[in-house]
């Protein structure tokens, strides 16, 4: 069956963007391909599957900058970007399954505020169990990983994953805040943000 799936990567980091991806394709083919939640795959597996997904499906994504994330409620921003991606589809499809970061009913209402295209919206917790959502999670993760590598190349700093649970990320923030500042989410509820002005 051909329909759409949406998922994101990078909601939780303190460094780097969030990426939201939409994949429209054949669920049966994706199942046979071995598509599953990106968190359950190695980097090499994600890259390999990414190439197959892009070749055989319609793929759209948006890279959401830290500065934009700082300006909005994260769920509202994610819903708006998701709706924009769906609105950009020219193909007629039956429905789109979307991984929900909150109660599915609430998230659906957020999306519908911005949706212009006539399509059935299905929001789910643990949406990655759906092959199209899983494919979107792979696309989002691969694109975000590439964006993180670009930041490392531009700054010359290996800050690890960008997540606050990563010791390398914490250390990099303490040592190189001035350089990393354009890529940092200022409103992240993380104790080091209280001390960021110490490094200005």
Swiss-Prot record:
The keyword Metal-binding applies. Residues 1-200 form the RNase H type-2 domain. GO terms for biological process: DNA replication, removal of RNA primer; mismatch repair. It is found in: Cytoplasm. Its cofactor is Mn(2+); Mg(2+). It catalyses: Endonucleolytic cleavage to 5'-phosphomonoester. GO terms for molecular function: manganese ion binding; RNA binding; RNA-DNA hybrid ribonuclease activity. Keywords: Cytoplasm, Endonuclease, Hydrolase, Manganese, Metal-binding, Nuclease. A divalent metal cation binds at residues 7-8, 99. Its main location: cytoplasm. One of its GO terms (cellular component) is cytoplasm. InterPro entries: RNase_H2_suA, RNase_HII/HIII, RNase_HII/HIII_dom, RNase_HII_arc, RNase_HII_hlx-loop-hlx_cap_dom, RNaseH-like_sf, RNaseH_sf. Manganese or magnesium. Binds 1 divalent metal ion per monomer in the absence of substrate. May bind a second metal ion after substrate binding. Its EC number is 3.1.26.4. Belongs to the RNase HII family. Endonuclease that specifically degrades the RNA of RNA-DNA hybrids. This is Ribonuclease HII. It comes from Nanoarchaeum equitans (strain Kin4-M).
């Amino acid at each position: 069956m051909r329909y759409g799936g949406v998922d994101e990567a990078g909601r939780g980091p303190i460094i780097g963007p969030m990426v939201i991806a939409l994949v429209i394709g054949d669920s049966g083919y994706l199942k046979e391909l071995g598509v599953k939640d990106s968190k359950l795959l190695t980097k090499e597996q994600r890259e390999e599957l990414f190439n197959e997904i892009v070749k055989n499906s319609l793929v759209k994504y948006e890279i959401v900058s830290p500065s934009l994330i700082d300006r909005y409620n994260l769920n509202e921003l994610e819903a708006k970007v998701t709706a924009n991606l769906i609105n950009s589809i020219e193909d007629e499809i039956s429905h789109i399954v979307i991984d929900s970061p909150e109660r599915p009913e609430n998230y659906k209402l957020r999306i519908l505020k911005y949706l212009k295209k006539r399509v059935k919206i299905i929001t789910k917790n643990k949406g990655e169990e759906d092959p199209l959502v899983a494919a979107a999670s792979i696309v989002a993760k691969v694109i975000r990983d590439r964006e993180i590598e670009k930041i490392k190349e531009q700054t010359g700093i290996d800050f690890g994953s960008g997540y606050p649970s990563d010791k390398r990320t914490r250390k990099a923030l303490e040592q190189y805040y001035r350089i990393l500042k354009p890529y940092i989410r200022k409103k992240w509820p993380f104790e080091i943000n209280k001390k960021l002005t110490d490094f200005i």
